[in-house]
Amino acid sequence: MVTENKEIPEAAKRDLKIALITLKYTQSNSVCFVKDGQAIGVGAGQQSRVHCTRLAGQKADNWFLRQCPKVLDLQFVDGIRRADRDNAIDVYIGEEYMDVLADGAWEKIFKVKPEVFTREEKRAWLDQMKGVTLGSDAFFPFSDLSLIHISEPTRLAL
């Protein structure tokens, strides 16, 4: 291992194993982000490893945004189906959040109209993500992760 630190923590070893097992069962040209024993973002089937990494990074960011107290505290209407709840969360944390916050839409999903999850709030939450493992089924054809344009929080969490 080419690094000054020659010891890998047990949690990192576990996450590396999970990344490799996950990658074994995905399409070729795959990338996987793992945190705390679970795959949180997988990118596969794209034309380049750059695109796979970007896709996996976006999924990892979305996974972490779902852990934010502002998202966990959303109050859904009684009887909402799990798929509808999950889709509403995905839209809420994304760029098209007004699709679920607009008058006439939010009442079908939420008991109380949620506040907008601002870009600044998302950035502040994502900046707290640490200890993410990145696995790939092959080498990266570039030397610097900044070249692949994954989100800054995901890059810093690696």
Where are these regions (language model features)?
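Residues that form or flank phosphate/diphosphate-binding pockets in enzymes
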Residues: H51, S143-D144
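Long, structured protein-protein interaction/assembly regions in large complexes
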Residues: M1-S30, V34-I40, S48-K130
